[in-house]
């Protein structure tokens, strides 16, 4: 199906961080599968401003954000870390968390040899484990 005929501008991949039900795939695993499928049918290109993938669920660190970007996400949502920072330290906690995440992203990008976010691509990740089904995932009767 042609994307334009459906007026689809993007998708949101969201779950509960895969904490609630065992054998459920994490948001990162689903992101990996979805972006591979979207690329295969020509709906997702790295520089395509007309289609975006957003993801959230289980994102806790700057490295998690970079992994999602490398796998094709245009934006990454975080809930729990910001709620915890707000509850514990108020506005200062939010600002401090944002600074920590920023520093984690900058340091990780330097270690990967990337100067800009558009240089963070899937080939900087070891995705072999994402190709494997979770134990019991396919055979589970629950």
Kindly label every feature range from the protein language model.
Residues 2-6, 71:
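Structural motif
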Residues 18-24, 61, 84:
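Short, small-residue-enriched loops and turns at beta-alpha junctions
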Residues 29-56, 60-142:
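Alpha/beta catalytic cores of nucleotide-metabolism and tRNA/nucleoside-modifying enzymes
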